[in-house]
Every structure is written in C-alpha cells, then in structure tokens.
Amino acid sequence: MQPTIEILDRIRKNSRDNKEEIFTRLYRYLLRPDLYYLAYKNLYANKGAGTKGVNDDTADGFSKEKVDRIIQSLADRTYTPNPVRRKYIQKKQNSTKKRPLGIPTFTDKLVQEVLRMILESVYEPIFSNNSHGFRPNRSCHTALKSLKREFSGVSWFIEGDIKGCFDNIDHQVLANVINAKIKDARLIQLIWKFLKAGYMEDWQYHATYSGCPQGGIVSPILANIYLNELDKFVEKTAKEFYKSRDRHHTPEYDKVTWQIKKAQKQLKTATGQEKTALLQKIAQLKAVMHKTPCMSKTDKVIKYIRYADDFILGVKGDKADCERIKRQLSDFISQTLKMELSEQKTLITHSNQYARFLGYDIRVRRDQKLKPHGNHVSRTLNGSVELCIPFADKIMPFLFGKSVIRQLRDGTIEPIARKYIFRCTDLEIVSTYNSELRGICNYYSIASNFNKLQYFEYLMEYSCLKTLAGKHESTSRKMMRKYRDGNGSWGVPYQTKAGIKRRSFARFMDCKNTDLWTDKIIDFAIAHIGSRTSFDDRLSARVCELCGKTNVPLEIHHVNKVKNLKGKQLWELAMIAKKRKTLAVCKDCHHKIHHP
C-alpha cells in the first residue's frame, strides 16, 4: 500500500497546480495507521506531550492497539473529542491580562495532528504569500523581511487589530469556508466536533459557541483557513486601488535642473571671477536639487502583511484613502467574518512616525543621504523601511519583570541579583541568563538599531554576576575573577563524560543573524519519508525493548527529559543507553515501570 504521506504530497501538488480544485473523500486518510505513527513522532518530543488534559491520557502508553481503537471509532463515527482543559497564561510581562489556553487529551492531539496534516496538504499551497503565521518555513522574521522589502516608499501604515480574534471565529462561517474547498461531510463533521467539544474550568463544563481553542493542534491552521478570506479581500482591494505612477518630474525639480543646465551652458564661455561664481552657483543648485522630490506622487498602492491575527497595511496615497480602506476592512470583517475590527487599536500612522508590528517599531526613512556613483551622486536611504527595537516598551519591562534591574530614586537603572534563583547551581544560573539574552537578541537580530542591545547585555551580565556573588556571599568582581577564562570572557566550568567544559556568558553580537534573509525550501515528501516510520517499525516488531519478550503487543513508555533519569532502574538505564525519550515495552514491563 502506498504510504499516506506520499498521497498527501500528491494532494499538495494538485492543490498548487490547480488552485480551484475541489477535494473529496479525504476522511479515508484518517483511517490509515501510518499517519498516527508520524503524528506521534511529531508530538512526543514536545514539552506538552506529558501534560494532561481532562484525564490521565498522555504520550505515555502509545501502542498499535491504541491506534487501532482510534481508527475504529473514526470508521464507525463514534469518536467524540473530550473537552479541553482551560488554563490561563500571562499575556505580556508585567501584564494583568491573561490568555486562555485549551489543553486537549493526548488522543485528541493525535487525531488533530493527523487532521492538521491533511488540511495542510490542501490549503498550504493556496494560502496567501502575505500570510506568515503558523506556516511551514515561515516566521515573524520572514514577515518582517517581506515588510522591509515590500513597504519601501509607502506614505501611511494601517495597523490592524481584530477584537479577540481566535475566541470569536464563527463556527458556521468556518465550516462554509472549508466546505467550499473540501466536499467531505465526514471530515467537516469531525472538525465541527472539535469546535463544539467545550472546555472544563474548575471542573465545570462549558459549551463553546465560537472560537478555536488556543493550544489545540489543529486550531492554527483552522484560524489561517478563516483569515485567508481576509487575505483574499485585501489583495482584491489592493488590485482595485492600484494606480500606476505617471512618471514625470515635479515642477520644483524641473525648475532646479533647468537652472543648472542654464548655468552649465554659461560656464562654457565664462572666464575669471565669472567662472568661479558660476561654479559656486552650480554646486548650490545641485545641493538644492538633491533635497527636492524628483517624482510626483500620483501612484496608488496597498501592501499587506499578516502574521496570525496581527496584520498591517502600507499605503501609497493620502489619509483619506486610508480612512476609506479602514472602513472597507471593518465592513468585511463584521459582515463576512462575523468579527469586529477594533476602532481604537486599528491605527492610521504616517510612515515618518513609528508604527508597531510584531514587537518592532517600523517607519519609512526620509534621509537625504547621498552616495557617489562615478561623476554623480544618488539618494540611497530615502524611502527604505527601518526596523527598530522599542527598547523602552519591550526590553525594559522584560528586565523589570525578571527582576534583573531596579530604578533608583534619581531615575538611574542598576542591575541587581535575582534572589529567587540562588538555589540553582552556577551552571543553571548562567544558562538561564544566556537563554533569556539569546532569546531577545535573536528576535531583534534584524533591527537597524541592534547595537542598542549592548546595554541590555551589560545589564544581564552584571545581574548574573551579582546573582552568583549573592549566592556565594562574595562580590561581582571576585566572581568575574574566579570564572575568567583568559580570553577576555568568563564562564562556568562543568564536568562531562568527555572532560571539563565551560559555559561562557553569551554575547549579543553572537546573535547577529547573517543568514536570515535566505528562505529554505524543503520538499514535503523528503522531509517526512524515512525516519518517520520508526515508531511503526518498533511496535510492529513485537519485541519488548526491556525484557526481550517476543510476539507480544507493545506500548510506548514516554518521559519528558532523558537527562532527568537517575539510572537507578533497569528501564532508566535502557533509555539512557538508547538516548531516547521513548521505550517500546510489553504491558507487563510497562505496568512494572509505573508500579515498581
């Protein structure tokens, strides 16, 4: 039988080659066991694999028999998703607002992952190129890269904000959108079951009437399918709005160039002081010319980028155009998508002022810097997009929230020790700071003011030294001296099987990403065929990897981290030796592991 992943790859190619194709009978691929082994491979390494939903179902205990039971329930259409367990997480550092997460059971995660793979094969090739959220080989950085390239020269920004986007997705609208592309009642009914599964909060069941639970495996692609309608609307609006530029010079520019040509003509016959005066006049006129707009702004253009529910438009036009576009957006979102565009947060900002997108401040530069080219000069930065770090709004709240710094009465900032991590080892303390520093610096590695993070590095480094000093009742200077490596940096030594290694304190310049602007294209089939069948092979072998018993049904024992195993039990030694988070064992061994 042909591997299902190859069939999905063929579906992907058909969708890419014929964007109007309607797909049918996709539900049957949910009944193929090989996709569930691939789904388990995709999920088991995640931190959430061991997180419980509303019951004790986790990645531990996965088996061929479990896959067979899931497939049978899907085949006879008795499969019913469990309600998700609702949990709240903080939205932002130092914010009192919280975001609800819905945590499914692991069995539901498996089915959702298989469903996600099927939907992705159909929709990924037809999603807008302006959409970057929750998509393979795309990220915040690819969205910002596209913005930097496409928004050059725009006059206005429209920052889009949909009120409670994920919580207000209309289930009927979503079902209608999917039904337009996929004519498969069983598949749409399964999606409907997940949408209507409800949630448990404080052991009370609550029905869901709208929205996709944040935390669900299939929720991101369902949100993208829904918001792809917004992408298509904006792109259609942009085509109608577009007006090509009448390429003619401004009267002011023509006047200056005419004066220069007249002076150059007079220069041919001039002598002495007259010639010197003309040369000075020409130089002054050229300086004026380089500061004068050369082309009339008669073009009309809309540029658009979306990352999940966060989107921004760049408009070449006037403010009245932006107001009209905003009204059109609001009408479409309310009438077609049944959601609401926030009037207060959907801002219209002139491009010489900063707008906010994906945690960056963006603006269009109006610098008149000149660059020599042979016998003439040209303007280089005018109209280019600048991405900046909002240091006061993003970095400082992060530092205060992590108790890295404090503000003195005179307003100055100083790094402080983080007493709540004194109990950690020196290696763990340095690793914590390194992880936080690299996370911030990697995200802002494409900012034009990236060097501002040198101050961030300084505050993090001296907070780390003060934390180590506080733990050992010493001083920062002594800790620096103790851990100095002789190469101008410092780090904590630690023992490994290969000998002593050193965890050096991270540097912000090491995070400057030089390869960011290259997109990697990965073939879908090549990325999944091969090692992805290892779980299938191990379970089908019917040989217990612990006791060696043969021809027995097996289950997967799962742990979150191999490094946390102590090596005191036989099964721990086996997992450490294999360097795996999973072990295929018989039911007797699995019972002994959990009940020694």
What are these regions (language model features)?
Residues M1-P596:
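Non-catalytic terminal/accessory segments
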